């Protein structure tokens, strides 16, 4: 693979951007935002976009790797995740999408993730979530944050980058990872390789389902989804898919779970959620899943912190 990524961004500039974003851990009195300028953010978007397009839509990764679920602009919690799991390149990472919206610092969150993607393109991976889509993040906070802190044109630059994100990953041919879940159109995992990018997220079909579907204990086969988008699927569909594709586990995000992770279908599917105390409205923990070389999965838990102190 041509190293367009690092080669088209001055490493010293990139390191300085990462340093400033990480300095948020020790903020000076009164500074709550790690400010990058418009051109720096655009460069992160342009360079990472090229890397996403050079790498496949279905990533094929090797363990060990640490997997994270939804972050939703909770930047201080993203930094806590890295403190638990090790700041790159101390560990390999796979994030399952939903970096923006709802939280207060979507810009810091996505900028740090894109910067790490550029710096460590073969060790740091980002999948697309349903919120990495213009029609969704126009409504749930990211558009407003871009407009308030920069301008609408910058939001459009992010949209172009999000349209190039990969949508699924396979770890050592045995663990399938995506943001949402399975699809009635997905028979063979190889089909995901045929999704062409850049692309918006359609209202129905394989790409939509990979980003939007949910497992349900109340369904056998496929059911209606209360979200009004995609489907729900039963434990039978998880087992059927894994047998057909000779795989062991589906790892996905997309739903708040109380303990940060939750198994389904006799531990054949796990839901990961990595934004503790989500939106300040839930008392959920966040989790980080470590997959070792033998594909053993273990979990590190981020307990919710006191809401009153979390942004001070």
UniProtKB/Swiss-Prot annotation:
Q: What catalytic activity is recorded?
A: O-phospho-L-seryl-[protein] + H2O = L-seryl-[protein] + phosphate; O-phospho-L-threonyl-[protein] + H2O = L-threonyl-[protein] + phosphate
Question: Its Gene Ontology molecular function terms?
Answer: metal ion binding; protein serine/threonine phosphatase activity
- Cofactor(s) in the UniProt record: Mn(2+)
Binding locations of Mn(2+) 2:
98, 130, 179, 254
Q: Where does this protein reside within or beyond the cell?
A: Nucleus; Cytoplasm
Top class in the EC scheme: hydrolase
Q: Where along this sequence does the record place binding of Mn(2+) 1?
A: 70, 72, 98
UniProt modified residues of type N-acetylalanine: 2
Originating species:
Arabidopsis thaliana (Mouse-ear cress)
Q: What does this protein do?
A: Serine/threonine-protein phosphatase that possesses phosphatase activity toward para-nitrophenyl phosphate (pNPP) in vitro.
SMART domains registered for this protein in UniProt:
PP2Ac
**What is this protein's name?**
Serine/threonine-protein phosphatase PP1 isozyme 5
Active site (UniProt): 131
Q: Which GO terms describe its biological process?
A: cellular response to abscisic acid stimulus
* Domain of life from the UniProt record: Eukaryota
One Gene Ontology cellular component term attached to this UniProt record is: protein phosphatase type 1 complex
Q: Which PANTHER family match?
A: SERINE/THREONINE PROTEIN PHOSPHATASE (PTHR11668), SERINE_THREONINE-PROTEIN PHOSPHATASE PP1 ISOZYME 2-RELATED (PTHR11668:SF511)
């Amino acid at each position: 693979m041509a190293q367009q990524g690092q080669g088209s961004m001055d490493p010293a500039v990139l390191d300085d951007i990462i340093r400033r974003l990480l300095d948020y851990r020790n903020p000076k009195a009164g500074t709550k935002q790690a400010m990058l300028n418009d051109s720096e953010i655009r460069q992160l978007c342009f360079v990472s976009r090229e890397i996403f397009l050079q790498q496949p839509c279905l990533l094929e990764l090797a363990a060990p790797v640490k997997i994270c679920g939804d972050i939703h602009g909770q930047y201080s919690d993203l930094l806590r995740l890295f403190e638990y799991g090790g700041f790159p390149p101390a560990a390999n990472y796979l994030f399952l999408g939903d970096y923006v919206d709802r939280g207060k610092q979507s810009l810091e969150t996505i900028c740090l993730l894109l910067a790490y993607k550029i710096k460590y393109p073969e060790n740091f991976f980002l999948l697309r979530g349903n919120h990495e889509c213009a029609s969704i993040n126009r409504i749930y906070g990211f558009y407003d944050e871009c407009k308030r802190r920069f301008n609408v044109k910058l939001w459009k630059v992010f949209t172009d980058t999000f349209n190039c994100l990969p949508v699924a990953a396979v770890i050592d041919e045995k663990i399938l990872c995506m943001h949402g879940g399975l699809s009635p159109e997905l028979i063979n995992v190889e089909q995901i390789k045929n999704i062409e990018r850049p692309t918006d997220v359609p209202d129905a079909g394989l790409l939509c389902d990979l980003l939007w579907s949910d497992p349900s204990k109340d369904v056998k086969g496929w059911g209606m989804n209360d979200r009004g988008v995609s489907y729900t699927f039963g434990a039978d569909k998880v087992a059927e898919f894994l047998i057909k594709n000779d795989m062991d586990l589906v790892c996905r995000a997309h739903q708040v779970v109380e303990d940060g992770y939750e198994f389904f279908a006799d531990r054949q599917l796990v839901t990961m959620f990595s934004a503790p105390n989500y939106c300040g409205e839930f008392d959920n923990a966040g989790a980080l899943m470590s997959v070792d070389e033998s594909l053993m999965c273990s979990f590190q838990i981020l307990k919710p912190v006191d809401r009153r102190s979390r942004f001070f």
